[in-house]
């Protein structure tokens, strides 16, 4: 296929931009265009079960409302995320305001690079977690805990998932403020967080899928939780990965999706695209453009 050159049009929308990237076809532009085509296939077919995996500071970086929209539009069937994104989604819903104060420490604020949140917001979160946990006892899966949290929030992707019945898995939840409060509560209450039950639930979801797709933002534990489950059925049929990590160190986060075929986590004939870049920038462009393409307003 001949490499084309980018042509600007004054009336170009995001869908048009992505189509132009696909027409160019080369290097990062081509990968972005192919990713849009794969995402379009995943989102336009009722036969594809779509997993969204999220590592890194997605909610602190402003993507929480986009995740909420994807859930409410029925574009994702399950979310696998780090505990930090769960915490920051709850903080936003509880009125904790993320502010951008530059790359510096500020008294009374916790910092994620140039984005800050007041430490008093975590006091509200602590009270919120006590209320949630006080109503739970015995063995509780992580997704059930996150659903209970979502039911008590007025907004955010946790609330959307609770409303729409979309499971949220967080296999590394103990490494977060949620995990800390679970541990504290379990010291003198009959409460056990059952992470194995989440694996049973995800395995059933994967086995029942006619086709399986994944949107992988970052990498780490959420990526592997999805790909490990996909191995139970011979691998993913579709996948788009956006990561800043590189493959030379052998890390999972930097591994291209083609590498997953050697582990049968991705099918040999799967349609995949790995984009190297900041997903906080790339994913909103990609998702918004494909939603335009599908007529979602």
From Swiss-Prot:
Pfam families, per database record: DS
Coiled coil: none
Residues forming the catalytic site: 265 (nucleophile)
Claim: Disulfide bond is one of the keywords in the record: no
One term of GO molecular function: deoxyhypusine synthase activity
SUPFAM superfamilies (alphabetical): DHS-like NAD/FAD-binding domain
This protein's pathway: Protein modification; eIF5A hypusination
Catalytic activity annotation: [eIF5A protein]-L-lysine + spermidine = [eIF5A protein]-deoxyhypusine + propane-1,3-diamine
Keywords assigned by UniProt, alphabetized: Hypusine biosynthesis, NAD, Transferase
GO-annotated cellular components: cytoplasm
Known cofactor(s): NAD(+)
Gene3D superfamilies in the cross-refs: Deoxyhypusine synthase
EC number: 2.5.1.46
InterPro entries on file: Deoxyhypus_synthase_arc, Deoxyhypusine_synthase, Deoxyhypusine_synthase_sf, DHS-like_NAD/FAD-binding_dom
Function summary: Catalyzes the NAD-dependent oxidative cleavage of spermidine and the subsequent transfer of the butylamine moiety of spermidine to the epsilon-amino group of a specific lysine residue of the eIF-5A precursor protein to form the intermediate deoxyhypusine residue.
Family indicated by similarity: Belongs to the deoxyhypusine synthase family.
Protein name: Probable deoxyhypusine synthase
Gene name of this polypeptide: dys
